[in-house]
A protein has these predicted regions:
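Non-catalytic, usually N-terminal nucleic-acid engagement modules in DNA/RNA processing proteins
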Residues: 1-114, 332-347
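C-terminal extensions of enzymes
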Residues: 1-12, 85-88, 254-347
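Conserved, mostly hydrophobic/aromatic
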Residues: 48, 70, 120, 205-206, ...
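Short secondary-structure boundary segments
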Residues: 49, 82, 150, 217-218
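Glycine/Thr-rich beta-alpha phosphate-binding loop at enzyme active sites
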Residues: 89, 96, 117-192, 198-204, ...
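C-terminal helical cap(s) of enzyme catalytic domains, especially alpha/beta-barrels
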Residues: 162-165, 224-246, 286-301, 345
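Active-site-adjacent pocket scaffolds in enzyme catalytic domains
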Residues: 192-195, 210-279
Length: 347
């Protein structure tokens, strides 16, 4: 079974030639354009509807406009306009927003030319609604994927979604394993998890837990803040001290020999031709980071094809052996092998 990684791209692309890439973009990047058009040429395009970003920023998207942009760009996959939850919402409001999400799924499926390109979003406010909502999607939606949306746990107020560069927690692992298990038991959908390809550690955690598809825009954000991604590891800072999130210690200040050795072996275009650009040019760092994440996805594909045990052995010995997130990896293995449906997880 193929493991998909969609590379995040924008109106001002890192590179125009994307003919060999699966690309993730967002409606919100084209919302104000009179004539939306792509500035790059992708192999395949997954167009997010922008609802998560709008929800976080308190914006309201018009269904007709979202639909118009999607039909104009005609992506290979896209998400009907959905209504994510926000922290502090009462259950009644969450239920109402799910009903609006359901209604839009039907409209998009029956009244647009997007047809089988649709990837419905799954939202749930407790264990029972998770199971029921998966079953509803299975019955009414003609798609091979669904996208995990708002999953309301007891820690929902502290969790903003799967985007960005958040450090994974046991609660997140619980939430994902529960949702993935429910999807597997109640449908034949494959799971897309938004924004989980920000680092090798996150990417492998997602794939190991059963995610079949994810995307990465974090490679660009990390690069802009002076960070590079090392194969099989996490981010390392090579900038001038202006980082505002994640690892901020300079890579060359007492770095481990293994880190430097891993970087020296990098086969990306920048590292082969001129490594010095990594220190001075964010685009060079972005090219490097994108290359690393694509290579990690290839490793995951090869190992999962050989069987779960082969993948687990690799993660044990290579990716998480010396990682500060090893405790999360050990917890993920427990949840993968001994899945539980916890009443405590959902309120």
């Amino acid at each position: 079974m193929s493991m998909l990684l969609w590379v995040g791209e924008q109106k001002r692309p890192l590179t125009v030639d994307r003919k060999s890439d699966l690309v993730m973009d967002s409606v919100i990047n084209y919302y104000g354009d009179e004539k939306p058009r792509l500035a790059y040429d992708p192999k395949k395009l997954f167009l997010d509807n922008g609802a998560f970003t709008a929800n976080m920023q308190g914006l309201r998207l018009k269904a007709e406009r979202v639909m118009q942009i999607q039909e104009t760009l005609l992506p290979d996959k896209t998400i009907p306009l959905d209504f994510p939850f926000r922290a502090g919402m009462p259950t009644k409001q969450m239920k109402n927003r799910w009903q609006k999400t359901r209604a839009n799924i039907i409209v998009w499926q029956d009244s647009t030319k997007l047809g089988k390109r649709l990837v419905p979003a799954l939202h749930a406010w407790n264990k029972k609604s998770l199971e029921n909502n998966v079953r509803w999607l299975q019955k009414h939606v003609d798609s091979d994927f669904l996208a995990l949306g708002s999953l309301v746990s007891a820690r929902f107020a502290e969790f903003g979604g799967f985007f960005g560069d958040r450090t994974p927690t046991r609660d997140l692992i619980d939430m994902l394993s529960l949702a993935i298990k429910s999807v597997q038991q109640n449908s034949d959908f494959r799971v897309h998890l938004m924004g989980f390809g920000s680092s090798p550690l996150m990417l492998h955690l997602g794939y190991y837990l059963g995610v079949a598809s994810t995307d990465s825009s974090g490679y660009r954000r990390k690069a802009a803040y002076g960070k590079i991604i090392l194969p099989g590891m996490g981010e390392r800072y090579v900038g001038d001290g202006s980082a505002t999130f994640g690892c901020q210690r300079n890579f060359f200040d007492g770095q481990r020999e293994s880190d430097l050795s891993m970087w020296e072996k990098c086969g990306c275009q920048v590292c082969i031709t001129n490594k010095d650009l990594i220190m001075t040019d964010w685009k060079a760092r972005a090219i490097h980071n994108e290359f690393v994440m694509k290579e990690e996805a290839k490793v995951a594909q090869a190992l999962t094809s050989a069987g779960l045990q082969a993948y687990e052995t690799y993660l044990n010995n290579q990716v998480f052996a010396n990682s500060s997130l090893k405790f999360i990896w050990e917890y993920a293995k427990l949840r993968r092998k001994y899945p539980r449906i916890s009443e405590v997880l959902f309120r």
